[in-house]
């Protein structure tokens, strides 16, 4: 024993002298965390290396055991632990391929024992540190630091909640770390015990040195239970226990291994008679109770590690016994059960084991954590852990070599941390996770024999980033598996190439951006991919250059050979060869979940990086997982934007300044020539000149000497006032002036955001005829890309509005020729000129070279679409909402900058979609996406919730106003207010419908069964949100729909989901970069999930046979059928919209049972009394149904059933004046379009719409979300301040069921038993109906009857939808607040402009003289204030206006901002006028 002790002391002293023992606790934890990652990486490398040599053997073995493995997997699925960290396919492969390396039976060498002891010392040291970190003293210190840091931004209860959340996360992280360390410690102890090391002596030495490494007072002064003097009572109890064990359980050991167990009390207990059993059992209880009594009597909950209670953990053999002894350590409440044993119960050992299992009494928490495991699971876990520890020791030896080599390296090669000479490969990730330094673009190579390869060390560069998650493993970094396509090095941080959709590292991205930002023509030509200047190859269709190495390395040698021999189309012109690299970039970006792009990604310029780094101090403490209202970061200044963005803003400002000055001149001429302002058409802009007989003039704002351009007379005669305004708006942006176009100006883009029904198609046709036929501008080709379902409508509109006085435009369509002749058709279009109509799908495929077999033809088509159009028009442009979609990328490849985006709903879901569309027409105007998030999206969305603070609302209004003002020059918005007087009134009722008892039961069971009501919906909601929503929506329509779908599936019919594809990724600004293929896969997965939910048997026991045939189980169906019946009685036609095909099928079933009025025994028939339009309806058949429905003589048809997505766009059903929306869409635009199918030109009756909404369910929350989206659009596009209707918390808890019906039903039952109560209930219902009828039915007799019939039984409440979108006067910005917000926005840009003015042109500005005043321009009565807002401009602004127009002393002009006449004499003192005269 003494020899072993001396040997052990020598080994510890030897290890203490080695450099392997780390110098600080922080470094120890760093090594532990980093080496786990490196061990996993090495396992993968070994796996790949060995896999090549052993591939055949492994494949043979897998083929032989494939059937057996499948059976075992099916049998063991229920017993496999979900929480197992090691039972994975990867670990099994590692073990199967590395058994020769593991060799657990081989005796350990002295060196390996030294390493094990070293590892144990490190693990125990970190475990002690973890325990100290969880002491009250340590926690109090950390809490005070956290509170002090958070107190800078938070106060009161909010501060307390934030501190509590941070501390909870802090403790959880340390407890998890402690749990991992204890697992490692147990494995190491087992190996040391097997090697013959006396563990008590080892622990005695560890404990004797423990106080020297403590930093808390509690641990420095604690009484150690090992190696210290204990009480006599404890010694006596231990001696009694030892004597009992020696008597009843004699054992013989050698080197710590159990060699033999004699006829102990266990065998005697099995084989002896009952009396002996009772005697032994009693003796055991008496012997052990004395020791347990010692611990139980002096138990103190406040006693921590190192006390007697801690020592008692070694006496507990089961978690139950540990819990009974009062131990509250990790693992106490985790109970594992061995798998079922197939054996005879006659075996006394098995029988006793089973009896013990049955008698096991577990606590509630232990029952919750009850896990069933297999015996091989434990073996696999053990072996994998030992393998990882062995590899970690090898890595530690390699680190010694790195340290030695690092001392001889230059300081420039290694990034040093303070005075420490060791390369900082791993910063502290647990205790101080503030920054981390990583090795960039290199992997240090270490041979098995310890040799160090420093070939790549000189390429190391530091990269600092914020570590958001203190426990995150570096192996999760998506850059670990990706290389930079420019420098071919491992990218520590994955970034997108500024020009190509491929992966580049940070250094390469910055280098490329610096080259792009330098527009000096004298610079050397360089590769657009990597920036090199050697071996460049020209693109034959554009001016871009690419080096041969980039082409060869990234695309392939074959492509390189072809490029050198016959020329090539570069990756910008033909991105098809980059598809693989683009997919890699998408994968890397999706894996980068822990870092939010808006706050941590690099901006497009160095100034962006500075703006991010100079933000308010970022909270880098361990963040809480609790979601709450965002705390937005500092809004970056406009001076910090990229150079390109600032340039485009300046161009737009100069354009508006020029237009304003010319507009005022035109206004003066108009007023003087007309004499009477009243003669100006009401509602039109003041600058409207010309008339319908001679043709409206489009270039009212024109330069001196420029001829007037008129709209053709035949078209002008049919234009309305707002349409004339829209044509002029497009001219001012697309053309600007005749001289500019002829001088080669590329023009600008715009968005015509007129709401549905205002004639956007007619306006575009009029504009194209004016620009391409009425004046010679050299513009002869136009490309119109539109949804395929309105493609033929465009052609018919061109034919309908064809003018007679000018040559008609040629119209081309792909359907006019065969596929083989498409290239010829496009060539003819480019040569002859005209308008080419094309669907989005065909445009995308042809632009990307898809669907064309002939390679030359494919290239020709791509070139024609890219270079051919002089004007590009995109109908329904809100489709352009995904920056990474193929359609968006194809449209952006078109070189034409004269782009017109048509949309009735420019902002549908979120601001990022709006940004995508704006960035298409004016690329770079709003900056990069992170800049837009910081400046507009986050402030606006953060202030639109009910629980937003006053400051949030104020910032929201300011940023909304600034965004509106910034975009109003090229985004023209008009709503139905301009034509309200031409249409009958419209009323939209939102009816809150109660659920039937069966619906409530099904709804609650689904939520509980699939975990949507347990408060743990974060990950589940993300994966299964829309599938669950579809199931619930169908239950809310009718509880029998699952039954109906089940029968349809048995008959081979499958109900489709209509209203899903674009909604899945457009609501919370997430996945807006999802590629098209992924979206289609998401759609298919969604359909499968919905079918899976409905095909399971969770609803079978609740539904009786043919429940779906009874309409009374759904309040929606009762109200729907009643509305249709009453509409038919009064002669009104109705439209019924629903999202799902099964719901429409069920409605058709009920309609087939409705009796015909006055026809005994006759019922409604499809095709006679109702029509149906869905996605399966052919285009020709659809138009026939629409025409028949709109026929005034067709009195028999009562309604048309329409699927929301398939029929809410592109059809006119003005014959109907009743619209019923059975289930609201996630996107409010679809429901709005559904209503506008009836409320449009041609409608003669008042329109009433009924939106049925299930009360207290997800439908009600989604409706509030719709109002939020419409309010967001109103704020940004329509500049209204609407009421906020939903809180952030409601948005995160959409599945919560607010079921008050059970309470109301209980009250109803009680009242029914009481006669007086019953009469009161009837009187209350009558009073409720009268009150609602008198106040809110809006003159709709049908709604009044509906309330009287279904009052409180089915209708919970109702309101008019428009009331929620009325402007909130309290939140409207005053003129002063608007001016202040706009002035703050313009201040940086104006200051930059002043700095750019030459000294000779910027006279000194004196202090304003009180005697100097400007005379305002007299405003006519018809002056439109919505366009020209009076402002108080500065003298500097007036000076800049005078300079920009080149005016001299004595001349005057009108300021486009404040509307004042300005002269040099008014803005500069007389003493300074001489300088202006000279200049």
Curated annotation (Swiss-Prot):
It is found in: Nucleus; Chromosome, Telomere. Residues 19-49, 109-199, 578-598 form a coiled coil. It comes from Arabidopsis thaliana (Mouse-ear cress). Residues 76-86, 598-615 have a biased composition (Low complexity). Residues 40-55, 94-109 have a biased composition (Basic and acidic residues). ATP binds at residues 754-761. Belongs to the SNF2/RAD54 helicase family. A zinc finger (GATA-type) spans 483-514. The ADD domain predominantly interacts with histone H3 trimethylated at 'Lys-10'(H3K9me3) (and to a lesser extent H3 mono- or dimethylated at 'Lys-10') and simultaneously to histone H3 unmethylated at 'Lys-5' (H3K4me0). The interaction with H3K9me3 is disrupted by the presence of H3K4me3 suggesting a readout of the combined histone H3 methylation state. The keyword Membrane does not apply. Residues 741-924 form the Helicase ATP-binding domain. GO terms for cellular component: chromosome, telomeric region; nucleus. This is Protein CHROMATIN REMODELING 20. The gene is ATRX.
């Amino acid at each position: 024993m003494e020899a072993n002790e001396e040997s052990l002391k020598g080994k510890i002293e030897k290890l203490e002298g080695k450099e392997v023992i780390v110098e600080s606790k922080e470094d120890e934890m760093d090594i532990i965390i980093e080496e786990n990652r490196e061990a996993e990486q090495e396992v993968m490398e070994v796996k790949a290396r060995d896999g090549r040599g052993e591939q055949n053997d492994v494949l043979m073995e897998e083929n032989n055991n494939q059937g057996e493995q499948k059976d075992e997997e099916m049998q063991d699925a229920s017993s496999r632990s979900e929480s197992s960290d090691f039972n994975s396919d990867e670990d099994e492969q590692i073990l199967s391929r590395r058994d020769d390396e593991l060799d657990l039976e081989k005796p350990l060498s002295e060196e390996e024992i030294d390493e094990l002891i070293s590892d144990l010392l490190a693990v125990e040291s970190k475990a002690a540190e973890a325990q100290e970190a969880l002491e009250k003293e340590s926690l109090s210190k950390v809490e005070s630091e956290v509170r002090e840091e958070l107190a800078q931004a938070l106060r009161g209860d909010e501060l307390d909640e934030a501190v509590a959340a941070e501390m909870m996360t802090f403790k959880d992280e340390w407890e998890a770390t402690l749990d991992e360390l204890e697992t490692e410690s147990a494995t190491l102890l087992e190996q040391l015990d097997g090697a013959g090391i006396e563990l008590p002596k080892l622990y005695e030495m560890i404990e004797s040195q423990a106080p020297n490494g403590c930093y808390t007072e509690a641990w420095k002064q604690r009484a150690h239970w090992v190696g210290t003097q204990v009480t006599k009572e404890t010694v006596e109890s231990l001696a009694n226990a030892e004597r009992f064990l020696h008597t009843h359980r004699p054992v013989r050991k050698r080197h710590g291994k159990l060699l033999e167990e004699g006829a102990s009390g266990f065998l005697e207990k099995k084989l002896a008679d009952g009396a002996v059993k009772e005697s032994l059992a009693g003796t055991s209880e008496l012997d052990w109770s004395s020791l347990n009594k010692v611990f139980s009597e002096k138990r103190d909950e406040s006693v921590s590690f190192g006390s007697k209670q801690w020592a008692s953990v070694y006496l507990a053999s089961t978690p139950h016994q540990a819990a009974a002894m009062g131990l509250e350590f990790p693992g106490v409440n985790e109970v594992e059960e061995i798998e079922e044993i197939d054996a005879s119960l006659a075996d006394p050992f098995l029988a006793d084991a089973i009896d013990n299992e049955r008698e096991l009494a577990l606590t509630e928490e232990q029952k919750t954590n009850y896990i069933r495991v297999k015996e091989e699971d434990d073996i696999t876990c053990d072996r994998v852990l030992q393998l990882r520890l062995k590899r970690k020791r090898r890595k530690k030896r390699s680190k010694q070599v790195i340290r030695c080599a690092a001392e001889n390296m230059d300081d420039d090669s290694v990034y040093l941390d303070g005075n420490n000479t060791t390369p900082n490969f791993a910063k502290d990730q647990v205790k101080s996770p503030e920054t981390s330094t990583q090795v960039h673009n290199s992997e240090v190579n270490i041979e098995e024999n310890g040799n160090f390869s420093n070939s790549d060390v000189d390429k190391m560069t530091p990269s600092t980033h914020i570590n958001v998650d203190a426990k995150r493993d570096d192996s999760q970094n998506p850059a670990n598996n990706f290389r930079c396509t420019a420098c071919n090095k491992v990218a520590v941080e994955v970034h997108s190439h500024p020009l190509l959709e491929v992966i580049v590292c940070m250094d390469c991205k910055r280098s490329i951006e610096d080259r792009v930002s330098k527009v000096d023509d004298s610079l050397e030509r360089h590769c657009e991919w990597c920036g090199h200047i050697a071996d460049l190859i020209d693109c034959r269709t554009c001016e871009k250059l690419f080096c041969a190495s980039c082409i060869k390395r990234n695309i392939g040698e074959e492509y390189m050979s072809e490029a050198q021999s016959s020329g090539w189309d570069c990756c910008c012109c033909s991105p098809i060869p980059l598809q693989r690299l683009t997919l890699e970039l998408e994968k890397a970006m999706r894996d980068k979940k822990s870092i939010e792009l808006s706050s941590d990604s690099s901006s497009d310029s160095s100034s962006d990086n500075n703006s991010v780094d100079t933000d308010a101090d970022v909270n880098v403490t361990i963040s809480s997982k609790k979601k709450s209202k965002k705390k937005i970061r500092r809004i970056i200044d406009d001076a910090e934007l990229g150079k390109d963005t600032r340039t485009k803003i300046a161009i737009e400002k100069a354009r508006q300044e020029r237009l304003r000055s010319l507009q005022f001149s035109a206004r003066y001429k108009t007023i003087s020539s007309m004499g009477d302002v009243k003669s100006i058409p009401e509602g039109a802009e003041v600058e409207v000149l010309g008339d319908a007989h001679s043709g409206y003039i489009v270039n009212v704002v024109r330069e001196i000497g420029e001829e007037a351009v008129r709209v053709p007379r035949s078209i002008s005669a049919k234009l309305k006032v707002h349409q004339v305004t829209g044509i002029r708006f497009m001219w001012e942006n697309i053309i600007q002036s005749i001289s500019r176009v002829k001088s080669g100006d590329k023009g600008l883009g715009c968005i015509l955001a007129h709401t549905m029904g205002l004639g956007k198609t007619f306006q575009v046709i009029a504009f194209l005829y004016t620009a391409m036929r009425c004046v010679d501008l050299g513009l002869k080709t136009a490309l119109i890309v539109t949804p395929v379902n309105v493609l033929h409508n465009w052609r018919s509109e061109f034919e309908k509005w064809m003018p007679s006085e000018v040559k008609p435009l040629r119209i081309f369509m792909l359907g006019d020729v065969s596929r083989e002749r498409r290239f010829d058709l496009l060539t003819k279009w480019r040569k002859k000129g005209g308008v080419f109509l094309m669907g989005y799908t065909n445009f995308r495929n042809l632009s990307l070279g898809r669907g064309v077999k002939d390679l030359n033809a494919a290239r020709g088509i791509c070139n024609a679409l890219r270079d051919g159009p002089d004007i590009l028009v995109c109908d329904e442009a809100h489709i352009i909402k995904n920056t990474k979609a193929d359609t968006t990328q194809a449209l952006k490849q078109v070189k034409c900058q004269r782009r017109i985006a048509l949309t009735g709903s420019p902002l549908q879901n979120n601001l990022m979609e709006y940004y995508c569309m704006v960035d298409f027409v004016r690329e770079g105007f709003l900056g990069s996406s992170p800049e837009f998030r910081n400046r507009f999206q986050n402030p606006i969305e953060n202030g639109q919730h009910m629980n937003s603070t006053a400051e949030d609302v104020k910032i929201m209004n300011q940023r909304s106003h600034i965004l509106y003002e910034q975009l109003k020059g090229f985004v023209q918005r008009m709503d139905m207010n301009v034509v309200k007087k031409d249409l009958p009134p419209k009323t939209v009722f939102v009816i809150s419908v109660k659920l039937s008892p069966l619906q409530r039961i099904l709804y609650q069971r689904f939520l509980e069964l699939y975990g949507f009501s347990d408060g743990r919906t974060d990950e589940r909601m993300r994966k299964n949100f829309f599938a669950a929503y579809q199931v619930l929506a169908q239950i809310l329509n009718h509880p029998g729909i699952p039954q109906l779908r089940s029968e349809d599936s048995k008959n081979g019919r499958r109900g489709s989901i209509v209203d899903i594809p674009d909604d899945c990724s457009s609501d919370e600004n997430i996945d807006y970069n999802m590629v098209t293929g992924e979206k289609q896969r998401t759609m298919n997965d969604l359909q499968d999930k919905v079918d899976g939910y409905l095909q399971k048997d969770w609803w079978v026991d609740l539904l009786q046979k043919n429940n779906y045939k009874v309409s009374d189980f759904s309040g929606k169906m009762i109200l729907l059928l009643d509305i249709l019946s009453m509409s038919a009685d009064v002669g009104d036609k109705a439209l019924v919209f629903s999202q799902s095909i099964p719901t429409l099928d069920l409605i058709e079933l009920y309609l087939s049972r409705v009796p015909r009025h006055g026809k005994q025994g006759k019922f409604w028939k499809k095709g006679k009394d109702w029509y149906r339009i869905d996605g399966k309806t052919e285009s020709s058949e659809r138009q026939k149904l629409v025409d028949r429905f709109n026929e005034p003589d067709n009195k028999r048809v009562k309604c048309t059933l329409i699927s929301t997505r398939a029929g809410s766009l592109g059809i006119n059903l003005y014959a109907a004046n009743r619209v019923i929306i059975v289930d609201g869409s996630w996107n409010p635009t679809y429901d709005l379009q559904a209503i506008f199918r009836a409320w449009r030109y041609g409608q003669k009756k008042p329109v009433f719409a009924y939106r049925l909404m299930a009360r207290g369910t997800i439908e009600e929350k989604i409706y509030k979300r719709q109002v939020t989206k419409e309010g967001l659009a109103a704020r940004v596009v329509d500049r209204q301040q609407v009421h906020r209707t939903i809180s952030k918390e409601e948005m995160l808890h959409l599945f919560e069921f607010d079921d008050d019906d059970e309470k109301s039903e209980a009250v109803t039952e009680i009242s029914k038993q009481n006669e007086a109560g019953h009469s009161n209930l009837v009187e209350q219902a009558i009073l409720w109906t009268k009150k609602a009828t008198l106040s809110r039915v809006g003159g709709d007799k049908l709604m009044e009857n509906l309330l009287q019939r279904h009052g409180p039984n089915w209708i919970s409440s109702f309101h008019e939808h428009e009331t929620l979108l009325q402007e909130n006067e309290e939140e409207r910005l005053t003129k002063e607040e608007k001016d202040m917000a706009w002035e703050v926005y313009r201040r940086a840009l104006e200051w930059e402009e002043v700095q750019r003015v030459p000294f000779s042109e910027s006279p000194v500005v004196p202090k304003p003289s009180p005697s100097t005043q400007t005379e305002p321009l007299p405003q006519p009565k018809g002056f439109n204030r919505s366009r020209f807002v009076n402002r108080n401009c500065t003298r500097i602004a007036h000076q800049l206006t005078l300079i920009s127009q080149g005016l001299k002393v004595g001349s005057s002009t009108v300021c486009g901002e404040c509307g004042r006449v300005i002269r040099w004499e008014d803005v500069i003192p007389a003493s300074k006028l001489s300088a202006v005269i000279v200049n």
